Amino acid sequence: MNRSQGIERLQNENDPWDVVVIGGGATGLGCALDAASRGYRTVLVEAADFANATSSRSTKLIHGGVRYLRQGNISLVRESLHEREWLLSQVAHQVHTQPFIIPTYAWWETWYYRIGLWFYDRLAGSLGIRSTQRFDKQSVLNRVPSMNEENLVGGVMYWDGQFDDARLCIQTAQTIWDNGGLALNYMKVTKLLKTDGRLTALEVLDVMSGKSFSIRSKSFILATGIFSDTLRQQDVSNNPLIIQTSRGSHIVGDEKFLPSGTALMIPKTSDGRLLFLVPWLNKVIVGTTDIPDDNIRLEPRTSAEEVDFILENFSR
């Protein structure tokens, strides 16, 4: 993956590309890899670095869809289980299994979650990782000694997937190159070029050199996440907005909170969301929040209210 050689190839290309993807996050990289692996002449351009925004700021989990079980969305649970199994088998060096404990503070909660996760195990079938286990109070404390033990009854342990989101994106970019495509970062789209009212080319700025040039293509895929409406309105100024933006924040704590490496899922918070405490690179990631935020920017900031929300629910 040599950026200079890629730009040279891009500038020397006379024929239109088959596919140009705008956006180098998980969605854009996935689209570009799919196209390149099917033999389409493909180029991806990203205005910043690969996975620079949402795609590198996740809770680092490959969900099997357990959160959708509560919503009754069985089809999405099945889809998530299949996707998790594919990643665990095909990208085993980036994805691994992770145990989670759901602590319970009433006897009925233990059976409520146990029965729900039993059904989840049945849905998973051969796609499951390990069977759900019911723990008594001491077994929970053995795994998570920092747990608030006041009124603690026990818990339920289930298994899910964990991955390095940014590394998987970088590997996907490399695989695009391996399949004959180009994935170029710090290439900002500055203008949409049309012929007879049809989009036929992009004008892009090489942020690192300051040089601009055009890229012609037969088709274009817009995968810029929260920035999608900006380009859509460059195309047609009165295009209706289609993106509703929100901000999800995490805080990072010391690994001493989860010394055994077992993650926690807190099923009840003050706003009804789930809260995860997940071991990660000798630290613990705690989150996430979900609040509306119309201030679209590359580097959002966590508010004091979000930190208070996480700490309040984490310390219960």
What are these model-predicted stretches?
Residues G23-G25, A47:
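Glycine-rich Rossmann-fold phosphate-binding loop(s) that bind the pyrophosphate
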Residues D15-W17, S209-S219:
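Core beta-strand elements of the Rossmann-like FAD/NAD(P) dinucleotide-binding domain
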Residues A36-S56:
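Glycine-rich FAD pyrophosphate-binding loop
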Residues G28:
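N-terminal Rossmann-fold NAD(P) dinucleotide-binding loop
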Residues K60-R143, L275:
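Dinucleotide-binding Rossmann-like beta1-alpha1 core, especially the glycine-rich loop
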Residues T104-G180, L184, L192-R198, E203:
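Flavin (FAD/FMN) cofactor-binding and adjacent substrate-gating region
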Residues M1-V19, D34-R38:
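Extreme N-terminal leader/targeting segments of oxidoreductases
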Residues V45, H93-H96, S214-I215, L222-R316:
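Active-site substrate-recognition segment that forms the wall
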